[in-house]
């Protein structure tokens, strides 16, 4: 049951829209760490930004 719910939720229009938004915003990201917070990077500094975009506006159960 849970695997069916996971497959359905990952293919939902909302999930795909969130992924597209995050990919569009961070399309200029470069590998490595940058000291400038305005420069997107595919390292730890970029991770909270992606999480913020994906989590904002949706409900996620961390207990399940």
From Swiss-Prot:
The modification L-allo-isoleucine is found at residues 55, 60. It comes from the Bacteria. The modification N,N-dimethylalanine is found at residue 43. It is found in: Secreted. Its main location: secreted. The modification (E)-2,3-didehydrobutyrine is found at residues 44, 47, 49, 59. One of its GO terms (biological process) is defense response to Gram-positive bacterium. Residues 1-42 form a propeptide. There is a cross-link at residues 61-64 (S-(2-aminovinyl)-D-cysteine (Cys-Cys)). The keyword Secreted applies. Keywords: Antibiotic, Antimicrobial, D-amino acid, Methylation, Secreted, Thioether bond. Belongs to the linaridin family. Antibiotic peptide structurally related to lantibiotics. Active against M.luteus (MIC=0.2 ug/ml). Has cytotoxic activity against mouse P388 leukemia cells (IC(50)=1.3 ug/ml). NCBIfam families: linaridin_CypA (NF033752). This is Cypemycin. The gene is cypA.
